[in-house]
Amino acid sequence: MTSSAMDNNEPKVLEMVYDATILPEGSSMDPNIMDCINRHINMCIQRTYSSSIIAILNRFLTMNKDELNNTQCHIIKEFMTYEQMAIDHYGEYVNAILYQIRKRPNQHHTIDLFKKIKRTPYDTFKVDPVEFVKKVIGFVSILNKYKPVYSYVLYENVLYDEFKCFINYVETKYF
């Protein structure tokens, strides 16, 4: 299936995305966080890259352990491997953030993730956007296991161009 053959019916995609962000009963999400996520989704739709990948990603970030273990979706199975990448890359920072969240559970946490810079043969520096987005997804997935309200960390740390590179990577690999 090519990306052009995908169903990009905007109302249907938006319905899927909004259904994917439903939290368990008793949970609540800060309206500012929802606004941030919705702005990013709207930007993605306006710029015409595949919002179905975003819907799958948002669904992945809200799935519980049983749903993850029973999934047949290859894209979600790949997303599950990103947690180890995040642990390898961010190490103790993951534990420090989790400690901070446990210490102040009702507070909004600003989480800035660093990027690993690579030196090019021309003595300049670059960041591999796909690898960075994978690590951020893994990091957010770890946070969401504690409390499923930290998806905003993904959208606060990843730029549009980096996200677009990641979407292209997923579409090329699976569609």
Curated annotation (Swiss-Prot):
Organismal lineage: Viruses, Varidnaviria, Bamfordvirae, Nucleocytoviricota, Pokkesviricetes
GO biological process: symbiont-mediated suppression of host cytoplasmic pattern recognition receptor signaling pathway via inhibition of IRF3 activity
Organism this protein belongs to: Vaccinia virus (strain Copenhagen) (VACV)
Protein name in UniProt: Protein OPG036
Family: Belongs to the poxviridae OPG036 family.
Induction context: Expressed in the early phase of the viral replicative cycle.
Domain of life: Viruses
Biological role stated in the UniProt entry: Plays a role in the inhibition of host innate immune response. Within the host nucleus, inhibits activation of interferon-beta promoter by inhibiting IRF3 activation.
A Pfam family of this chain: Poxv_Bcl-2-like
UniProt-listed InterPro entries: Poxvirus_Bcl-2-like
Keyword field contains tRNA processing: no
GO terms for cellular component: host cell nucleus
Underlying gene: OPG036
Keywords assigned: Early protein, Host nucleus, Host-virus interaction, Inhibition of host innate immune response by virus, Inhibition of host IRF3 by virus, Inhibition of host RLR pathway by virus, Viral immunoevasion
Cellular location(s): Host nucleus
